[in-house]
Structures are given as structure tokens and as C-alpha cells.
Design a protein with these regions (language model features):
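Active-site anion-handling motifs in enzyme catalytic cores
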Residues: 1-274
Length: 274
């Protein structure tokens, strides 16, 4: 069976690693990463497969993450976004089915390219392929971006009511740990997205200025959910757990958005699951 072809950053970071899991679970096909950003040895391995893709006229799927700027004329775009307001497409993709949010769409439209008004990070659909129920044993789960992990661990690692979750500790492990928390606060976008997927209350945290993009990807995602003007809760050395818990406000998950994103998935088949 011919595999599917996609591009993503090869890393342990949840949003990057989720590409393979999501695409293979939804398509029941193997997926090959043909990103030009792979290291030399991985590029050499993927090169013959990419040549086969070109010969057969197969598209390259661009799915989860702030990798929309990587898309080219062979790309089918389903759900990624830009990492900052300064990024642009290099050329018009073969097809754009959905993007992460309205801010990414506005950039595409400003370039004179077509982009449907269909939004959502595909990780919102993770609960479809890995259905699990929450079992809260911690008052709060903190999911820092990997650049903030050591700092967050130092601040809150000793708190018995708090679980500090390593976003690079494995796709399913992160989800399982998150489901053990009553609420989730995260400086990592996909910590917030997977919380929404499983309907766990969430809060955007900011530990530092190390997360690149000046908050663009967070605002892009939140605007797709109809949540405008959301700002992060700033964590300092003096921020207590009760301060974070007190910053949560109720919000609804846009299930219509998830349904529309699912409807336009270009590689889905019947029978989900991993």
C-alpha cells in the first residue's frame, strides 16, 4: 500500500510528534516525513520515497504545528498555522482545506491566495483517535513549553496538588497525565489544545519570553474558538498555585469547529483508533 507523505519537525515535542500518530490513525496508512528540515541521515532515507511521491503525483500533507510557512505547490494544507505575524507562504499550496485560525488565514488572504473559513488545530481531534475519560487526582496540571520546563518544575514540582507534565514525555503519556488533573495551565500551545480536545478546563500561562512568535499562535488558536483578546497569565517567582487556580474562567469548546475540521480531513477513513 502506498504511504502518505507529510512534513513536520522531527522532535519529541508533542505537537510535532502528533503528526505521525494522527495521520496514521485517521488514514490507516503509513506516513513518511519528507520535510526538507530533516537532518542529513533522515533526508537520505526519505529521498527515494519522496522521488516516488513526485513520480506518482502524490501531495504532501501539512497538518499539525506552526509549519504553514513550509507549505509549497505540492502541499495539501489541513490545520497548521504560522508561528508569527511576520511569516508568509513561499508559494500557493496545491490545496488549502483548513488553517489553525483566522490570523493565519488573514496572512494568506493578504498574499492573494484563497483560503476557506475553516479553522482548527487537528490535535483537537485527538480524543477521537484516543478516547479516554478524565480521572482527576491533582487539582492542577502544569504543562510548560519545553523551554520553560525546568523553571516550572523548580517553582511547582514539590506541590502535592500539582502535576508538572513534560510535553516531550510521549504522546499518550502526556494525555494520560493531563486527564489526571482537574484543570490544566500551559505555556505550550498543544497543552491547551489537548485540554480542549478532552474538555479539561485550561489556562494560558507565560513563564518567560522564550517561546517564539510573541504569542501569535496562541491568539490564532483562541480566535478560531471565538475567544478574542485572550492574554496569558504571567507567572513570576512569587506566583502561588492558588493564584493560578483563581485565574481560570469558564469557556465553551466550539464543537461545530471540530466537526467542520473533521469533515474536510483529506485522508480520513472509517474506524478510528490507535
Amino acid at each position: 500500500m502506498l504511504p502518505l507523505f507529510a512534513i513536520w519537525e522531527e522532535s519529541l515535542n508533542w505537537g510535532d510528534a502528533a503528526n505521525r500518530v494522527l495521520i496514521e490513525a485517521m488514514s490507516h496508512k503509513r506516513v513518511v516525513n519528507v520535510s526538507p528540515h530533516l537532518n542529513k541521515s533522515r533526508r537520505l532515507v526519505s529521498l527515494p520515497k519522496n522521488l516516488l511521491r513526485v513520480l506518482l503525483g502524490q501531495p504532501i500533507y501539512v497538518v499539525v504545528g506552526s509549519i504553514l510557512a513550509w507549505a509549497d505547490k505540492d502541499s495539501v494544507v489541513w490545520g497548521p498555522g504560522f508561528i508569527s505575524a511576520d511569516e508568509r507562504l513561499r508559494e500557493e499550496p496545491k490545496q488549502i482545506l483548513a488553517v489553525r485560525g483566522p490570523l493565519s488565514r488573514d496572512i494568506i488572504l493578504s498574499q492573494g491566495f484563497n483560503c476557506p473559513q475553516v479553522y482548527g488545530d487537528p490535535a483537537l481531534l485527538f480524543s477521537k483517535i484516543y478516547p479516554r475519560e478524565p480521572y482527576p487526582t491533582y487539582d492542577l496540571g502544569i504543562i510548560p513549553h519545553f523551554v520553560d520546563y525546568e523553571y516550572a518544575k523548580r517553582l511547582y514540582g514539590a506541590e502535592k496538588s500539582v502535576l508538572v507534565i513534560d510535553i516531550t514525555s510521549g504522546i499518550f503519556n502526556v494525555v494520560d497525565q493531563m486527564l489526571g488533573c482537574e484543570r490544566v495551565a500551559s505555556s505550550c500551545l498543544h497543552g491547551l489544545v489537548i485540554a480542549d480536545s478532552y474538555r479539561v478546563p485550561s489556562l494560558w500561562l507565560k513563564f518567560s519570553d522564550k517561546v517564539i512568535g510573541r504569542g501569535f499562535k496562541f491568539r490564532d488558536y483562541y480566535s478560531s474558538m471565538g475567544r478574542e483578546n485572550i492574554k496569558p497569565f504571567i507567572v513570576t517567582e512569587n506566583t502561588r498555585v492558588k493564584d493560578i487556580l483563581g485565574a481560570f474562567t469558564p469557556h465553551r469548546i466550539n464543537t461545530k469547529l471540530r466537526d467542520e475540521l473533521w469533515d474536510v480531513c483529506p485522508f480520513k477513513t472509517g474506524g478510528l483508533g490507535v
